[in-house]
Amino acid sequence: MNLTPREKDKLLISLAAIVARNRLERGVRLNHPEAVALISDFVVEGAREGRSVADLMQAGAHVIRAEQCMEGVPEMLHSVQVEATFPDGTKLVTVHHPIR
């Protein structure tokens, strides 16, 4: 299978999000990379489903709660930026204050 660097990045984010979901199901708190991966995957999949940029910016801030993360992680994440492919092209989506 020949994947472009962009496709490899998307696959890695997706895999990290799967790991994060499994850890949440077991009650394990997420670290910084896991939290970013879960939010990023939510945005990428939402774009694929046809949701709007504005909708994903707002909804992305409600994917993870502060109590689901390790201490200090919510304070470290001021924003998450993801390039996502929408029906009308690729756009940069910024989720401000993603963990509340």
From Swiss-Prot:
It is found in: Cytoplasm. Pathway: Nitrogen metabolism; urea degradation; CO(2) and NH(3) from urea (urease route): step 1/1. Keywords: Cytoplasm, Hydrolase. Belongs to the urease gamma subunit family. Its EC number is 3.5.1.5. PANTHER family: UREASE. Heterotrimer of UreA (gamma), UreB (beta) and UreC (alpha) subunits. Three heterotrimers associate to form the active enzyme. It catalyses: urea + 2 H2O + H(+) = hydrogencarbonate + 2 NH4(+). NCBIfam families: PRK13241.1 (NF009712), urease_gam (TIGR00193). Pfam families: Urease_gamma. CDD domains: Urease_gamma. This is Urease subunit gamma. GO terms for cellular component: cytoplasm. The gene is ureA. GO terms for molecular function: nickel cation binding; urease activity. The keyword Membrane does not apply. Gene3D superfamilies: Urease, gamma-like subunit.
